[in-house]
Amino acid sequence: MAKQLLGKEVTAALNERIKANVAELQGKGVNPTLCIIRVGENPSDISYERGATKRCETLGVACEKILLPGDVTQDELLATIDKVNKDDHIHGVLLFRPLPKHLDQAVIENALAPEKDVDCMTDLSMSGVYTGKKIGFPPCTPQACMEILDHYGIDCTGKKAVVIGRSLVVGKPAAMMLVKKNATVTICHTRTVDMPSVAREADIVIVAAGRAGVVGAEYVKEGQTIIDVGINVNAEGKLCGDVDYAAVEPIVDAITPVPGGVGSVTTSVLVGHVVEAAMRKVNG
């Protein structure tokens, strides 16, 4: 039976560090503040907003919301972003995406000030992931994967790692973060030839394929660590990951469950980025 890499244990440790930093900031008269910008009434956005708001409250971080109609114009949204960019008491901004199709998402994303970009929305923030410079912040989900590896003492140095998925949101930044941990990394995608055999060669596999249960027993071997980023709803209406947990768990050494794995850490990473943004501002 594989060891379960439980997100709640990682979150508890991360939250303690965040609380200590919040106390330090408040001692200097600074109240770290997140601003959430939501366009329209997407249920998944509303759900994440609810979770982020609750986590902020728990950790002593202020959370403001700007709720805009689904038919908001490009100019109106850009003006909103410009306003929060100039608001000194707001340290981090989360804009829910994807945006409605009548909006130019790339232009809007890059209008945000990188120092307030707590979920790697801008091109400048993404460049920071690849250069190692503190420009903005890395995406919260791949950062949550790294927090899990760190918390459970899984050393990546010299290990073979496979990332399944090549999105800019998870796959590519996760691969770069693993490289920084001295792993030898392969990125797999829909055009990869014989993906199961490639995945079986790895010591660590991060799965961000975007399809429920796509990674089965043929992808894994004994001794592996599996990080499942996927969040899907199966035919029974239950949450499940991109990994076929029932098939994979008996084989591998360690695995994150869904739910209860990466997703539960991601929200604390977001709040931690807001606090770090405030600390960067205070410390210059």
Indicate residue ranges for each PLM-predicted region.
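Rossmann-fold NAD(P)-binding glycine/threonine-rich loop
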Residues: 106-126, 230-282
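Short, well-structured alpha-helical segments in soluble
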Residues: 76-88
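Short beta-strand elements in bilobed, periplasmic/extracellular small-molecule ligand-binding domains
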Residues: 56-70, 185-187
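Short beta-strand segments enriched in small/hydrophobic residues
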Residues: 31-40
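Glycine-rich phosphate/diphosphate-binding loop of Rossmann-like nucleotide-binding domains
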Residues: 39-53, 127, 136-225, 234, ...
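Short, well-ordered coil/turn residues at beta-beta hairpins
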Residues: 96, 208-209, 229
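Anion-binding alpha/beta catalytic cores of soluble intermediary-metabolism enzymes, centered on
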Residues: 92-156
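Positively charged, low-complexity intrinsically disordered leader regions
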Residues: 1-30
